[in-house]
């Protein structure tokens, strides 16, 4: 029997050799030159009779070889980092892995190549990037994500780490066959990439609030290629949902397709790159890990900045071109009219690199229309253009070597909506964010949270505020607010001057806007984090001086979230957006990229650069180099803001609120063109109102505020925290009283209010409100007044005021009693003022009731108010009760019924609350 089995095996091998002569020879040649892994040999069938090992092994190899070649025969072959076999008939894709590629680290970059154009599912968004390796376990191949968070130089501790912290085995794959001549492993790539590898089902559930399931029958592979250093693969996933969602951009929301691009590449090793240590005074994204061999008792983490590998061609020259510049490609999908602005935004950074010793460190090239590569290819840094219904954002993600922090890839994505709508009637850009629910309006900590929800916008905007699984809250906020800023600039451009802007003026405005956006995103791809202190470099009177802004810069850093620079009335308009990078940007690039002179003399390790880097970082106390990033703007620091400008926000905010009032006057005088819908007037009115309160909210950060600098002990004698001066705090309170709480803070003519009609279009992408149609002016004003008032009296601020009394000399701090008394006398002026009685307007009555409610909540302990705040609220209520009683006794006969009822009801509320508090004790 064995004889016939052996004969049959020989016949099969001969048949295979007839059909596969070339591959067979090639395989034998590889076998002679390759080193067969012992682990792979152990997986072969055991041979009991040692005398026949050679013969049996030869037969087994021939059978396995025939099975291997029978699988990949007559299908397309792509050779490269990993060899890919593509079967058009079956749709199967096979991946060939060499023995030496097992247990070796590779970088995976996953990108959403096509989306649905709304609700956070946008083309070009990064999905993930991580380090992985293939590990063979018996007859299966594991796809394992490497744990890079813990490291050590000690061999003994490495054994401990391996037991203590696990890698993540994402998939266990069947080994289809093994080539016996070279031990190459063949796997079915469908098992890996035709599953929901990137977790899109979770993304869709989060973003669309619906259950979508991957449908294998609708999923398939798209373009793919294999290069010597990387493999590029497209997977198209079909998703189905029984009920669907409220997507409006697809024909039927029960089914949709998403394309995902995978880039698997080998890590660049021994290329001379030296990781650079991070410093908290300079804002870089970092690669951090815990080093168990670090003997420093105060710090177990090692932090490297993320940066490109940039080396001077001439190390001895003070200014040298790089050996290999950083190249950005403008995608061929970018409209022609925007390419110059994008190019300028990228090249703005060459000025900063000159301070680091590099000439023309960055280059920009145009992607050909017939390019044979994809924008998501790891070898190309591409500025991409996409379209959406509801996004309006740009993003600049980068991918790094997780061992060293070396940036290996960066792609910037820009939504066409950011610039397209600026050119289509200036009001149109505001439409996406024009309405708001004032109860969600938050101020005093992070004005970025002033996101206006919308009944007028309908379900689409409600989703937009809750989706964005792929975008952080700050990124999504930037997208919303940046669009608003551009809209306000365009609206101001058309309203504030006596004449309408020319097409050239509007073109220049759009050019400046897009250039600024690109510069900001390129900064991220160079490794830089946000710097929300960057907008405070110039004094208010310098903002429109182009002799300064064209040389030194409009701001200290383009990495801030910058508002449009609108000149006050009577001042000639300067730059709307920055055209050059600022001093902080130059200094940060110097820290990250300047060549260490010692590097040419000896081998450099990161720790040996500490003194060199410290000399650069010592400049941090200079005002124009101040740094505050995302986690800093939640504090009450009036100089660490988003959407502010100048070193004196008090003056800047007043200028912008005056501009808003002037725009209201222009709208009141009949701004609409003949035949234009009154709904456009409502959009503009809303936009100006939002702009007004955004600037008012900046003032609240002065109350109990303090500046913060990331100083080190050797920097200088300055303090890390410096409370805002008492004078500035009092000025801020005065401005808030004048522009927010005063009786005449808001004055709109009946004619204007009666023209604020809503849009009545009802179709996909546009929802008409089904509630009251007229403009709810009382609710809008009160909700925003209430937001600012509540922020002034929240527990965090009162605790801060209490602490600051211990941090300043006597008499130099704004006390809680002064804050409460100033607000009460300003809001209840009609009660405390002497003289003839005046009727209290409806807007003032609403504000006074809100103020009273806040004090009652503080006193009755329904909030986290500190004890001193609670007793002071009791005191203020007693004073208010007495003042109301006195006023009613003096002038009750001459008061109108609105005012009389309001005062009597307010006094009664206070009396009942005071009595209730006494009973509770």
Functional labels for PLM-detected ranges:
Residues 497, 504-509, 534-921:
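Conserved catalytic/binding loops enriched for acidic/polar residues
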Residues 366-386, 512-568:
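The catalytic-center signature of Zn2+-dependent metalloproteases
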Residues 347-358, 388, 523-524, 528, ...:
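Sec-exported extracytoplasmic/periplasmic mature domains
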Residues 9-20:
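Bacterial N-terminal signal peptides
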Residues 25-27:
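Boundary at the C-terminal end of the N-terminal hydrophobic targeting segment
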Residues 338-345, 506, 510, 514, ...:
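Stable alpha-helical elements in mature extracytoplasmic
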Residues 2-10:
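Bacterial N-terminal signal peptides that target proteins for export
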Residues 30-334, 352, 356, 361, ...:
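Auxiliary tRNA-acceptor-end handling modules of aminoacyl-tRNA synthetases
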């Amino acid at each position: 029997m064995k004889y016939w089995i052996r004969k049959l095996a020989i016949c099969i091998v001969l048949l295979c050799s007839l059909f596969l002569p070339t591959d067979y020879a090639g395989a034998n040649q590889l076998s002679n030159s390759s080193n067969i892994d012992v682990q792979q040999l152990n997986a072969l069938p055991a041979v009991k009779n040692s005398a026949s090992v050679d013969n049996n092994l030869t037969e087994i190899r021939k059978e396995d070889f025939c099975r291997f070649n029978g699988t990949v025969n007559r299908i397309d072959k792509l050779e490269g980092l990993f060899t890919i076999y593509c079967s058009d008939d079956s749709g199967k894709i096979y991946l060939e892995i060499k023995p030496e590629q097992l247990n070796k680290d590779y970088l995976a970059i996953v990108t959403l190549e096509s989306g649905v154009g709304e609700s956070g599912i946008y083309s070009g968004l990064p999905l993930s990037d991580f380090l992985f390796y293939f590990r063979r376990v018996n007859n299966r191949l594991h796809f394992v994500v490497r744990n890079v968070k813990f490291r050590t130089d000690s061999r003994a501790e490495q054994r401990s780490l391996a037991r203590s912290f696990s890698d993540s085995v994402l998939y266990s794959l069947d080994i289809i066959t093994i080539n016996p001549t070279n031990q190459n492993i063949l796997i079915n790539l469908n098992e890996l990439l035709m599953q929901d590898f990137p977790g899109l089902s979770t993304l869709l559930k989060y973003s669309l609030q619906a259950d979508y399931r991957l449908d294998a029958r609708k999923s398939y592979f798209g373009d793919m290629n294999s290069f010597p250093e990387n493999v590029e693969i497209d997977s198209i996933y079909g998703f189905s949902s029984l009920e669907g969602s409220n997507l409006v951009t697809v024909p039927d929301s029960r089914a949709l397709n998403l394309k995902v691009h995978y880039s698997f590449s080998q890590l660049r090793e021994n290329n001379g790159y030296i990781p650079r240590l991070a410093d908290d005074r300079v804002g870089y994204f970092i690669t951090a890990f815990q080093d168990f061999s670090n003997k420093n008792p105060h710090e177990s983490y090692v932090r490297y900045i993320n940066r490109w590998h940039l080396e001077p061609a001439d190390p001895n020259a003070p200014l040298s071109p790089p050996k290999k510049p950083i190249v950005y490609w403008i995608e061929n999908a970018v409209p022609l009219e925007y390419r110059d602005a994008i190019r300028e935004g990228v090249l703005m950074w060459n000025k900063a690199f000159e301070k680091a010793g590099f000439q023309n460190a960055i280059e920009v090239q145009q992607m050909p229309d017939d390019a044979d590569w994809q924008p998501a290819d790891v070898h190309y840094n591409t500025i991409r253009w996409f379209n959406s219904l509801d996004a309006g954002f740009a993003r600049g993600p980068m991918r790094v070597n997780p061992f060293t922090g070396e940036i290996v890839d960066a792609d910037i994505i820009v939504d066409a909506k950011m610039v397209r709508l600026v050119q289509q009637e200036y009001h149109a850009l505001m439409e996406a964010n024009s309405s708001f629910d004032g109860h969600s309006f938050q101020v005093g900590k992070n004005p970025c949270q002033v996101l206006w929800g919308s009944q007028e916008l309908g379900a689409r905007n409600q989703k937009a505020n809750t989706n964005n699984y792929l975008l952080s809250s700050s990124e999504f906020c930037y997208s919303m607010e940046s669009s608003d800023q551009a809209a306000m600039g365009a609206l101001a451009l058309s309203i504030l001057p006596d004449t309408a802007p020319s097409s050239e003026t509007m073109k220049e405005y759009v050019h400046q806007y897009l250039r600024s956006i690109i510069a900001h995103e390129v900064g991220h791809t160079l490794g830089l984090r946000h710097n929300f202190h960057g907008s405070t470099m110039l004094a208010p009177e310098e903002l429109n001086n182009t002799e300064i802004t064209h040389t030194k810069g409009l701001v200290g850093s383009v990495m801030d979230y910058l508002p449009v620079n609108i000149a006050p009335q009577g001042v000639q308009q300067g730059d709307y957006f920055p055209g050059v990078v600022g001093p902080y940007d130059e200094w940060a690039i110097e820290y990250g990229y300047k060549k260490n002179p010692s590097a040419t003399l000896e081998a450099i390790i990161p720790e040996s650069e500490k003194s060199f880097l410290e000399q650069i970082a010592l400049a941090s106390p200079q005002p124009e180099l101040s740094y505050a990033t995302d986690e800093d703007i939640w504090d009450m620091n009036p100089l660490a803001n988003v959407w502010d400008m100048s070193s004196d926000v008090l003056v800047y905010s007043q200028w912008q609120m005056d501009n808003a009032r002037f725009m209201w006057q222009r709208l009141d005088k009949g701004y609409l063109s003949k035949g234009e819908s009154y709904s456009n007037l409502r959009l503009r009115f809303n936009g100006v109102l939002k702009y007004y309160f955004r600037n008012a909210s900046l003032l609240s950060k002065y109350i109990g505020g303090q500046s913060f600098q990331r100083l080190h002990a050797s920097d200088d004698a300055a303090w890390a925290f410096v409370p805002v001066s008492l004078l500035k705090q009092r000025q801020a309170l005065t401005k808030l009283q004048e522009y927010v709480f005063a009786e005449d803070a808001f004055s709109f003519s009946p004619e204007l209010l009666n023209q604020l009609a809503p849009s009545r279009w009802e179709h996909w992408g546009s929802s008409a409100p089904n509630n009251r149609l007229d403009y709810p002016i009382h609710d809008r004003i009160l909700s925003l007044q209430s937001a600012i008032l509540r922020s002034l009296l929240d527990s965090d601020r009162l605790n801060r005021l209490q602490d600051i009394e211990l941090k300043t000399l006597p008499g130099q701090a704004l006390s809680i009693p002064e804050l409460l008394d100033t607000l009460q006398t300003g809001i209840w002026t009609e009660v405390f003022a002497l003289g003839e009685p005046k009727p209290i307007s409806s807007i003032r009555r609403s504000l006074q009731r809100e103020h009273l409610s806040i004090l009652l909540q503080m006193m009755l302990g329904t909030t986290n108010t500190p004890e001193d705040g609670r007793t002071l609220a009791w005191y203020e209520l007693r004073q208010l009760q007495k003042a109301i009683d006195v006023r009613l006794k003096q002038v009750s006969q001459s008061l109108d019924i609105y005012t009389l009822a309001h005062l009597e009801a307010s006094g009664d509320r206070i009396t009942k609350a005071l009595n209730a508090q006494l009973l509770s004790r």
